[in-house]
Amino acid sequence: MTTSLQDGQSAASRAAARDSPLAAQVCGAAQGRGDAHDLAPAPWLHARALLPLPDGTRGCAADRRKKKDLDVPEMPSIPNPFPELCCSPFTSVLSADLFPKANSRKKQVIKVYSEDETSRALDVPSDITARDVCQLLILKNHYIDDHSWTLFEHLPHIGVERTIEDHELVIEVLSNWGIEEENKLYFRKNYAKYEFFKNPMYFFPEHMVSFATETNGEISPTQILQMFLSSSTYPEIHGFLHAKEQGKKSWKKIYFFLRRSGLYFSTKGTSKEPRHLQFFSEFGNSDIYVSLAGKKKHGAPTNYGFCFKPNKAGGPRDLKMLCAEEEQSRTCWVTAIRLLKYGMQLYQNYMHPYQGRSGCSSQSISPMRSISENSLVAMDFSGQKSRVIENPTEALSVAVEEGLAWRKKGCLRLGTHGSPTASSQSSATNMAIHRSQPWFHHKISRDEAQRLIIQQGLVDGVFLVRDSQSNPKTFVLSMSHGQKIKHFQIIPVEDDGEMFHTLDDGHTRFTDLIQLVEFYQLNKGVLPCKLKHYCARIAL
């Protein structure tokens, strides 16, 4: 009798295993642990009753008997096709292991604008940094990443903006905006963002820097930069600034001192004695902004304004407005305040641009060049047989020659339509070629050109080419040098019926603007420096 019961029990177990693979796995695991007697069903139970039923189904038989006694018509019950899965006590455990966990990182939609006011909406996590937002836009738009792409916070109601540092959390920046404020995030290049690490001599003039302790000999700008990053010693920035009085429209010229603890001004001339110094602003709970139209918006004496704004929503009353005499002075003040506020974090952003807090790490970011692009080699097809060019200098010269040949073919193609003269052919070719270049900005004014260059950083060699407003058939090269913007007229010269472009009264001539720009990117010539970075308006 006992043997027959055990045989029936094992048969029922095998039937249950066939009906429910999950139950078979659980039972098999239990038998491996020696717990088979705890899970073994009684011999008089059906195979489908191996696993206990939920509490709601235990009294079904009693309810049916009560309904039968009361002559209540019974509704036909719908059988559960998988009672083992829904009734198993192990269901919650198995589900937790088999199904992926939900992502706990909250996401938020942000809108980012470009210089032409086109925008793009991004669904980003709450801990995304400014650098990661830039990286997303670079990848989505297939831009070249030269580490100069920057996210800007633009506050139009008070006419200021600032660079959002690469490590800052974008959602925290947005949380400080007022509900009715029409603030924007702008995405554009800023070549001057970390330029002070490369060329500190342009950012710290000798007459504006002093030291708390006496120093032996002269201190180089590189040593001054190292002092800003250290925690023991620090330089002191000082000079005259125009300050707007609180609650008034008037400005007052005062002597200021910038120290690690904050910004102070002297109540007695240029004296820096403690009894003559009065506190003006600190850095911890404030951000430094640059004024966009100080004269027009705030009645400033110059356009080189900057201000301190608390980390909260507010209007012009919360601003502490300052104004410098020249661009170099403003750049020195703003750079020193950034260094004192963020310290080594700025240097880490400069050295390790991809180390963000969110998911966009250096491993998840695709490189600038793909594997297939890196495997490309330079080839020369000028002879009867093609050959691989191994010398980089030769490869560059061949590429230049091919570019010139392509432009000559373009001239011939344009010359086949009708019978224009050589001069008209050259002008038509120029119109067809240079308008497609990102550095050409067509009919923009002198002020607009200066605004674009200032926005993208007053670094030596930042340039653009535009149409001349004074001479309709000529062009102008606008460039930055020494934190100043200079404009050079590109003069057309005709020789033997052919038109050329020149910057030096015809000593160096170019058939088109592309040749001119490429030449001055490699040679200084009559310019104060080589052309390095072009200003480009991008669309998102």
Curated annotation (Swiss-Prot):
Q: What positions does the domain Ras-associating occupy?
A: 106-192
Q: Which residues are annotated with the PTM N-acetylthreonine? A: T2
Membrane spanning segments where? Answer: none
Q: What is known of its domains?
A: The PH domain binds relatively non-specifically and with low affinity to several phosphoinositides, the best binder being PI(3,4,5)P3.
Record bears the keyword Phosphoprotein: yes
Q: Does the keyword Transferase apply?
A: no
Name of this protein: Growth factor receptor-bound protein 14
Localization (cell): Cytoplasm; Endosome membrane
* Highest taxon of source: Eukaryota
Q: Which residues form the SH2 domain?
A: 439-535
Q: In which tissues is it expressed?
A: Expressed at high levels in the liver, kidney, pancreas, testis, ovary, heart and skeletal muscle.
Q: Which GO terms describe its biological process?
A: insulin receptor signaling pathway; negative regulation of insulin receptor signaling pathway; signal transduction
Q: Which organism is it from?
A: Homo sapiens (Human)
Give the keywords, sorted: Acetylation, Cytoplasm, Endosome, Membrane, Phosphoprotein, SH2 domain
Task: Give a Pfam family name.
Answer: RA_2
Q: Which family does it belong to?
A: Belongs to the GRB7/10/14 family.
What the protein does comes down to:
Adapter protein which modulates coupling of cell surface receptor kinases with specific signaling pathways. Binds to, and suppresses signals from, the activated insulin receptor (INSR). Potent inhibitor of insulin-stimulated MAPK3 phosphorylation. Plays a critical role regulating PDPK1 membrane translocation in response to insulin stimulation and serves as an adapter protein to recruit PDPK1 to activated insulin receptor, thus promoting PKB/AKT1 phosphorylation and transduction of the insulin signal.
**Subunit structure of this chain's protein:** Interacts with the cytoplasmic domain of the autophosphorylated insulin receptor (INSR), through the SH2 domain. Interacts with GRB14 (via BPS domain); this interaction protects the tyrosines in the activation loop on INSR from dephosphorylation. Binds to the ankyrin repeat region of TNKS2 via its N-terminus. Interacts with activated NRAS. Interacts (via SH2 domain) with TEK/TIE2 (tyrosine phosphorylated).
GO CC terms for this protein? Answer: cytoplasm; cytosol; endosome membrane; intracellular membrane-bounded organelle; plasma membrane
- Effect seen on changing Q348A: Loss of inhibition of AKT1 activation. Loss of inhibition of MAPK3 phosphorylation. No effect on INSR-binding
Q: Which residues are recorded with the post-translational modification Phosphoserine?
A: S372, S375
Which molecular function terms from Gene Ontology are attached?
Answer: molecular adaptor activity; protein-macromolecule adaptor activity; receptor tyrosine kinase binding
PH domain: residues covered? 234-342
